[in-house]
């Protein structure tokens, strides 16, 4: 670990109790992390329009995008809160709450709301309980019943995910399925079809590979602490060979994005500005990772937030130029 970087700061004692801010930060609303979750839904909608040859009416599609943003953000808030609550000891009583409270064991995370004392565990649990009906209601109200049904696998896997960091060496695979699964609500919102979601699988696999990829970069920040605490991750499992894994995941992303573009008959806009730029970014990410500097992985993770935003912009550009016209669109 580099000794030249700034050390992790701790919160002053005067700010240790701040429940509203604690709820805000537990939901990760002070970060851009939720962006990584709604990108795939927008990709799903854009690709579905190509596969189904759907013409979209601008205002209806704008309302749909708002629904996707609101629903995915609420889902992210709810389950980030859930992930932070060390309640798992109620389910597995032979372990203490500290065993499941991973933030206490990671230096970078000790300033988060629960370990810093900003909010108590019962208060955090109550916040999660409040997020659940809100998430369901906003999804149903803005996107309708079919899209709400397509969210169910995402919600179920989000309940399972926090346990996986203690129970399996590759929890990022579960996270990949969760965020990759956000492709399907976007797809269903355009097609209204829950029966032919196999058409969305190439995009799902591209997204899932990308999620595992960027989360492995993120996990390299905490390698010393994770090893000491027994936290499981692909970064810990692969150790010094992690760059081989990252390169393989990069190849998978590009291959599945190419398959997606072929099946949806996407234009050169997506091929050149989207896949082309993505293919150049992957080797740059892998070569930029310095395992001796725990801040290196965090920098590449942030670069992937920007890359996902860029791909979302490219997808919307192609959609607007080719498929958004003044014609009726039914949002399901």
From Swiss-Prot:
Annotated metabolic or biological route of this protein: Secondary metabolite biosynthesis; terpenoid biosynthesis
Species the sequence originates in: Aspergillus niger (strain ATCC 1015 / CBS 113.46 / FGSC A1144 / LSHB Ac4 / NCTC 3858a / NRRL 328 / USDA 3528.7)
Protein purpose: Polyprenyl transferase; part of the gene cluster that mediates the biosynthesis of yanuthone D, a fungal isoprenoid epoxycyclohexenone that acts as an antibiotic against fungi and bacteria. The first step of the pathway is the synthesis of 6-methylsalicylic acid (6-MSA) by the polyketide synthase yanA. 6-MSA is then converted to m-cresol by the decarboxylase yanB. The cytochrome P450 monooxygenase yanC then catalyzes the oxidation of m-cresol to toluquinol.
The protein's name in its UniProt record: Polyprenyl transferase yanG
CDD domains from the UniProt entry: PT_UbiA_COQ2
Gene, per the UniProt record: yanG
Entry GO CC: plasma membrane
EC class (word): transferase
Traits of the deletion mutant: Loses the ability to produce yanuthone D. Also leads to the loss of production of yanuthone X1 which does not have 6-methylsalicylic acid (6-MSA) as a precursor.
Use case: Yanuthone D is an antibiotic against C.albicans, methicillin-resistant S.aureus (MRSA), and vancomycin-resistant Enterococcus.
